[in-house]
Amino acid sequence: MHSVLVLDFGSQYTQLIARRIREIGIYSEIVPYNTPLEKIREHNPGAIILSGGPSSVYGESAFHPDEGIFKLGVPILGICYGLQVIATHFGGSVDSSAKQEFGRAEIQVERHDGNPQSMLFKDIPDSHVWMSHGDKVVRMPEGFRVTASSGNSEMCAIEASGDKAALKVFGLQFHPEVQHTLYGKQLLSNFLLDIAGLTPDWSPKSFIEHQIEEIRTTVGKNTVICGISGGVDSTVAAVLVSKAIGKQLHCVFVDNGLLRKHEGDKVMKILKPLGLSVNLVDAEEIFLKRLKSIASPEKKRKIIGRTFIHIFEEQIHEEKFLVQGTLYPDVIESVSVKGPSETIKSHHNVGGLPKRMKLKLIEPLRELFKDEVRAVGRELGIDEDILMRHPFPGPGLAVRVLGSVSKTRLDILRDADEIFLEELKSQNLYHHVWQAFSVLLPVQSVGVMGDKRTYENVLALRAVESSDGMTADWAHLPHEFLSRVSNRIINEVRGINRVAYDISSKPPATIEWE
């Protein structure tokens, strides 16, 4: 099975390229732009795509790939910065544009007798595309031709032609991977299926079959342990490994007392029909004891992480392997051209287990994006209610009770959050938002209930829309809905007399408050 290799030059859209390719049914991988030719050969790519990027190809710190890629005989498509890399490599020129293009633009496709000159634009009319560039090609490389133009970019799309046509090298100034490019997926499909001749043979089913075989080979007769939370990633990972090795997998669910209302019972009920062997550990007392009087969010996260490790360590006996629900965006972040980004928050993850345990990692989902994890889950027969659950932070409600954590404050938050989620589901809004939750603030406000003055807690509601959690906009929920939720919480939850709605987007805010 041939894959498509995406060379990452630092574009914010690089992950989108890989996702769009997989939607076409072809497996894709992202590697840094400076990956050596030998490593690229090892991937045996059926096509290579050069991503966009923030640099200028004529700058001193410009990024350039190994020039050997142009001699591999593999079709190459350059996007934005990738186009400019191609243009300069083959002798063309790139310069700063007098008029930058950011946002929608219309392209005109070059035609002959009514048909596009390039196979790349088969079945694609003049249409809107998404631009994001300050530089443009100002001199065409010899042996190339223009296949599309825009009002500001005469060489908006180019390709090798004539004696160089056999190179199958193409360049686009716009971004076909972005949804605002109306025929972007069609263009990528033309490149991959018609020009590169690849077969769309990647699917959740083929992925599962490959992983089961690989897990069995890796594990042999050894036993495996998996920390499970009832969330999408850990559940899908556990079920996939269980399909491969059955009773050799032991799952541990640590109830840290920081879960949503009745969450422990719900998780065990969810996991039972999936055929998993799960050991429930009630650790509420030790977690709350160690968190007492701790207000700093970073300290809370570290205490929770250390405590989890301590408890999880007690559950490990003869196991040689640990299952972890790492996803592809985590892998990309660790190897991208930008390198690991600055730590905004410490991540609570079983991956922090001490090295002395000498557990080998099994990461069956490390090649998948979140939407693909859900698709694999469906193929495995996991219930839709589990697969479409909203993300929940590893440290649980400890980072939604701002300030110090106590059982009393946790219970107040649980009751309020249950009302919010219950109303979202009853109004068919739950699946229209990426994530929704409540936050108990470390402030109190004056209120009046009946004839009495109150001085009680303030609660914030948070709901966001997103496709991947990398960026998010606040959800524009109906005013009548918010009014009903607020009234219910204030009347039904003791200890809250004021409700606010968070209308911050990410960035600059993060989705979670801590």
UniProtKB/Swiss-Prot annotation:
EC numbers, comma separated: 6.3.5.2
Known function: Catalyzes the synthesis of GMP from XMP.
Single GO MF descriptor: GMP synthase activity
GMPS ATP-PPase domain residues: 202-389
Keywords per UniProt: ATP-binding, Glutamine amidotransferase, GMP biosynthesis, Ligase, Nucleotide-binding, Purine biosynthesis
Group of enzyme by EC: ligase
Pathway of action: Purine metabolism; GMP biosynthesis; GMP from XMP (L-Gln route): step 1/1
Top-level taxon of the source organism: Bacteria
Entries under Gene3D superfamilies matching the protein: 3.30.300.10, 3.40.50.880, HUPs (3.40.50.620)
Residue stretches making up the Glutamine amidotransferase type-1 domain: 3-201
Active site: C80, H175, E177
Keyword rRNA-binding: no
Keyword Transferase tagged: no
Pfam family, any one: GMP_synt_C
Protein name from the UniProt record: GMP synthase [glutamine-hydrolyzing]
One GO cellular component, as annotated: cytosol
Catalysed reaction equations from the record: XMP + L-glutamine + ATP + H2O = GMP + L-glutamate + AMP + diphosphate + 2 H(+)
Binding of ATP, residues: S229, G230, G231, V232, D233, S234, T235
